[in-house]
Regions:
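Flexible coil segments in periplasmic/lumen-exposed cytochrome c-class electron-transfer proteins
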Residues: 47, 117-162
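Cleavable N-terminal signal peptides
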Residues: 30, 34-37
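Electrostatic cytochrome c docking/interface patches
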Residues: 37-65, 116
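N-terminal secretory signal peptides that target proteins for export/translocation
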Residues: 1-12
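Gly/Gly-Pro-rich "capping" loops immediately C-terminal to redox-active cysteine motifs
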Residues: 53-59, 77-113
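The canonical Cys-X-X-Cys-His
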Residues: 62, 66-77, 128, 132
Length: 162
């Protein structure tokens, strides 16, 4: 009996089936760090970026500030460019997952803009963070995010909703 070789379409179908079988596992692994970050925040009494920690008005101010001070390098879409990293998307979200907003605030405040770091006020940075959070799909609340370091330390950046 002559053995038939798999056709190109059958190989594609097998590859697609394999990918579909692996996707749920990949999704579970991708959300595991966020699940742990949520659990840790709840255990320590901290809030997360999903707890409506900024106001819509503050995000609006942050958008204006971002467009004036940041968009030249980070682009209006927050996608980054040749000169600056992205401020949205999976790489950005996973790199900040589990860290405090105080860490993010300090990073921006001490390194931006790259040619004259530290010139932005704490309020400008906080407003821009509120805009970044809104842009990345986090829900606004009714109270502005404070720039007080102790309060920012108590808010964890968590990539995925609980």
């Amino acid at each position: 009996m002559k053995q038939r070789r798999p056709t190109r379409n059958s190989r594609r179908a097998i590859s697609l089936l394999g990918a579909l079988m692996v996707m749920p596992l990949w999704a579970a692994l991708a959300t595991a760090p966020s699940t742990a970050a949520h659990a840790n925040a709840r255990r320590t009494g901290e809030r997360t970026t999903w707890d409506s920690v900024f106001s819509a008005a503050q995000a609006g101010r942050g958008e204006t500030t971002y467009k004036q001070l940041c968009a030249r390098c980070h682009m209006e879409t927050l996608a980054g460019g040749d000169e600056a990293g992205e401020l949205t998307g999976s790489a950005f979200m996973s790199s900040w997952n589990g860290q405090s907003l105080a860490d993010l605030h300090e990073r921006i405040r001490s390194t931006m803009p790259t040619d004259t770091p530290g010139v932005y006020t704490a309020q400008q940075v906080t407003d821009v963070i509120a805009y970044m959070l809104r842009f990345n799909g986090f829900p606004p609340g009714s109270i502005d995010l404070t720039h007080a370091n102790d309060a920012l330390k108590g808010i964890r950046f968590v990539s995925f909703p609980p």
